[in-house]
């Protein structure tokens, strides 16, 4: 005789979903940093990954206030929609925003402006802000699926007194045990989203109804093509004489400096539609739409060795 009774998990064997496991891991990392370090900061650009990270950090300490500030390294070449969302989310969360300006470093002669993109020189601004504010840990939204240099970086990534990363001297990380030991002047970069994928990020955004800048969804925009990428026409990004401008329905998979961030043609106007597109994507968002990663095969690793995000 057969039975139609479905046997569920035994009492005490409650199972978390994949997304909730990732959430729990990230919250554990954030709380670990808050307990272990004196002056942490959350790097916050207003992009999807940093917004998810802020959402997780607020959740980690609710109903209390976030016990550390957020910081944006501002190149001055930003998408207006992203800056507006950044300011609104920070105000709604009631957290302190530190803005580290690349323009200030250019004006002070600490760096020489690079053309067309300021992306390479923002490392100087980042390290200056960490040093001046005496931050000993900085949360970043990097994920291992984005790029090969990030794929081999630890959750707790040690930086020396010059802010440099040495991939050959990384510390072992067993299970959920993290080594935050450092001397004065050194700091740790912390990546709570290391084990997330782009698909996970969008699934979590949908599940938690996380608000994003409008440019992550399909919209009409004037663009031009350069090096196989669609770039947006912007006051800081103008086409060359041989680059015709046309209007297309596009969205951005990742958000960074206007001068090195491309968009993709898309009709996805909702989170569900973006998730469906992401599920069949064969290139990561950085591989598909970030010109700064195409400088060389080791472009990201070279920048990270110098102190980049």
From Swiss-Prot:
Looking up Gene3D superfamilies in the UniProt record yields: HUPs
Listed pathway(s): Sulfur metabolism; hydrogen sulfide biosynthesis; sulfite from sulfate: step 1/3
Query: What Pfam families does the entry give?
Result: PAPS_reduct (PF01507)
Q: Which GO terms describe its biological process?
A: cellular response to oxidative stress; cellular response to sulfur starvation; hydrogen sulfide biosynthetic process; sulfate assimilation via adenylyl sulfate reduction
Key words, A-Z: ATP-binding, Nucleotide-binding, Nucleotidyltransferase, Transferase
Q: Which GO molecular function terms does the record list?
A: ATP binding; sulfate adenylyltransferase (ATP) activity
Copy out the induction comment. Answer: Induced by sulfur limitation and oxidative stress. Repressed by the presence of cysteine.
What does the record give as EC number? 2.7.7.4
- Keyword check for Transmembrane helix, yes or no: no
Record-linked InterPro entries: PAPS_reduct_dom, Rossmann-like_a/b/a_fold, SO4_adenylTrfase_ssu, Sulfate_adenylyltrnsfr_sub2
| UniProt keyword Ion transport present | no
Report the catalytic activity: sulfate + ATP + H(+) = adenosine 5'-phosphosulfate + diphosphate
**Listed transmembrane segments:** none
Q: Name one GO cellular component term.
A: cytosol
The similarity comment for this entry is: Belongs to the PAPS reductase family. CysD subfamily.
- Job of this protein: With CysN forms the ATP sulfurylase (ATPS) that catalyzes the adenylation of sulfate producing adenosine 5'-phosphosulfate (APS) and diphosphate, the first enzymatic step in sulfur assimilation pathway. APS synthesis involves the formation of a high-energy phosphoric-sulfuric acid anhydride bond driven by GTP hydrolysis by CysN coupled to ATP hydrolysis by CysD.
Query: How is the quaternary structure described?
Result: Heterodimer composed of CysD, the smaller subunit, and CysNC.
Extra remark: Was identified as a high-confidence drug target.
Q: What is this protein called?
A: Sulfate adenylyltransferase subunit 2
């Amino acid at each position: 005789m057969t039975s139609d009774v479905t046997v569920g998990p035994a009492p005490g064997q409650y199972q978390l979903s994949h997304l909730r496991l990732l959430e729990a891991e990230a919250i554990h990392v954030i709380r670990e940093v808050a307990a272990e370090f004196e002056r942490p900061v959350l790097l916050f650009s207003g992009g999807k990954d940093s917004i998810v990270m802020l959402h997780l950090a607020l959740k980690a300490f609710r109903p209390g206030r976030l016990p550390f500030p957020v910081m944006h390294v501002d190149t001055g070449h930003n998408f207006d929609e992203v800056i507006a969302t950044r300011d609104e989310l920070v105000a709604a969360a009631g957290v302190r925003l530190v803005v580290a300006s690349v323009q200030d470093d250019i004006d002070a002669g600490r760096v020489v402006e690079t053309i067309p993109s300021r992306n390479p020189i923002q490392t100087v601004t980042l390290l200056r802000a960490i040093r001046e504010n005496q931050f000993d840990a900085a949360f970043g939204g990097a994920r291992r699926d984005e790029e090969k240099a990030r794929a081999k970086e630890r959750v707790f990534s040690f930086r020396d007194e010059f802010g440099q990363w040495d991939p050959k001297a990384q510390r072992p990380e067993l299970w959920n045990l993290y080594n935050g030991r450092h001397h004065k002047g050194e700091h740790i970069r912390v990546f709570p989203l290391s084990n997330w994928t782009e698909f996970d990020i969008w699934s979590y955004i949908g599940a938690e109804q996380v608000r994003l800048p409008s440019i992550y969804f399909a919209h009409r925009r004037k663009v031009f093509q350069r090096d196989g990428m669609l770039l947006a026409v912007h006051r800081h990004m103008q086409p060359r004489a041989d680059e015709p401008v046309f209007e297309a329905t596009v969205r951005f998979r990742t958000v960074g400096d206007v001068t090195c961030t491309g968009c993709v043609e898309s009709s996805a106007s909702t989170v569900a539609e973006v998730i469906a597109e992401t599920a069949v994507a064969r290139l990561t968002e950085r591989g598909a739409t970030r010109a700064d990663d195409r400088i060389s095969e080791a472009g990201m690793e070279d920048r990270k060795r110098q102190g980049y995000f």
